[in-house]
Regions:
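Non-globular, low-confidence helical/coil segments that flank catalytic cores
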Residues: 2-306
Length: 306
């Protein structure tokens, strides 16, 4: 912060000496020099370094879509990949975070706002394994992802409830989808990543029917951090499901001013009724959560609007 104040002081002095005609030139020179990068564009200089046994989760702001990057001990996992037009943003974010290889890639379900740029991420980095539900979609977006996976010499794997994947020694438990559904949202892969005494539950876009089916399986879905399903739609996050998660924090990935009115007031009320502190990408931008296995902390790109 001290360095920031020094640069602002120098900038003000320069503007005072040269007059208003040179404001644009001076600003451009300062910006191009890169000295303000870490203050103006945090993601440009962001590099993730997390010890083994700890984890950092980046809920990347991709508007009305989902994308989360998990990091632990130099290993990375990507859950969903935003919309089609998020490719450059996501790939650049991952590159600047120091990603060379994605050990696990999860497309929770084949809707464009969740797998839109997965093909770009798969093509840009070395890939360990790709997981998607055993359901297809007759869309170019879905076919692009399959082509990207094939281009890496891999096959999409279809996890089932009860499976436990490994992410740098951290268990990734699969809870859903439980069965076949007519609604693609309910085909969402629902998973929990545990780190020591803490846990993170990712729910894709699973809706109430799918949530009840998961509860009926008797899984322990308790978590400290809940990635709220379906951008905060009232058709998800039923009270019983929230009660069983017993989460302290809720993260909603949602676009500002979206046409669906997400997150809906009834969903926010449910989350508040269960005492969850709510973070929203439409208000706070990219949200980062850190855990050492005991403690959890949050930071965000910007402060919430009053």
């Amino acid at each position: 912060m001290k360095k920031m104040k020094q640069w602002l002081l120098l900038l003000c002095l320069a503007l005072g000496l040269t007059g208003c005609d040179s404001v644009g030139e001076i600003l451009n020179e300062v910006i191009q020099s890169g000295v303000l990068d870490e203050y103006l564009w945090p993601e440009k200089v962001q590099k993730i370094e997390v010890p083994d046994g700890e984890m950092e989760v980046h809920f990347i702001d991709v508007g009305q879509a989902d994308c989360a990057l998990l990091a632990s001990g130099g290993h990375f996992m990507l859950i969903d990949g935003g919309n089609n037009d998020d490719a450059e943003h996501i790939v650049t974010y991952l590159q600047n975070a120091g990603v060379k290889k994605l050990d696990l890639v999860v497309g929770t379900h084949p809707h464009e706002d969740h797998i839109g740029s997965l093909d770009a991420a798969i093509e840009a980095f070395d890939i360990g394994a790709v997981y998607m539900p055993d359901v297809s979609a007759d869309t170019e977006t879905y076919r692009d992802v399959l082509d990207a996976v094939e281009g890496k010499g891999l096959q999409v794997q279809h996890p089932v409830p009860g499976d436990v994947l490994d992410f740098n020694g951290l268990p990734v438990e699969i809870f859903g989808p439980v069965k076949e559904y007519s609604n693609l949202n309910n085909h969402s892969i629902v998973l929990r990543v545990s780190v020591g005494e803490t846990a993170f539950l990712f729910t894709g876009d699973v809706e109430i029917e799918g949530e009840y089916d998961i509860l009926e399986q008797g899984f322990d879905i308790s978590a400290d951090v809940l990635k709220v399903s379906h951008h905060g739609s009232s058709g998800s996050s039923v009270e019983e499901f929230l009660a069983y998660t017993d989460a302290d924090y809720a993260v909603i990935s949602v676009g500002e001013g979206n046409i669906y009115d997400h997150p809906e007031a009834v969903t926010l009320k449910r989350l508040q009724n269960y005492g969850m502190e709510i973070f929203r990408t439409d208000e706070q931008g990219t949200i980062v959560c850190d855990t050492d296995g005991k403690n959890i902390s949050f930071r965000q790109e910007r402060e919430s609007k009053p």
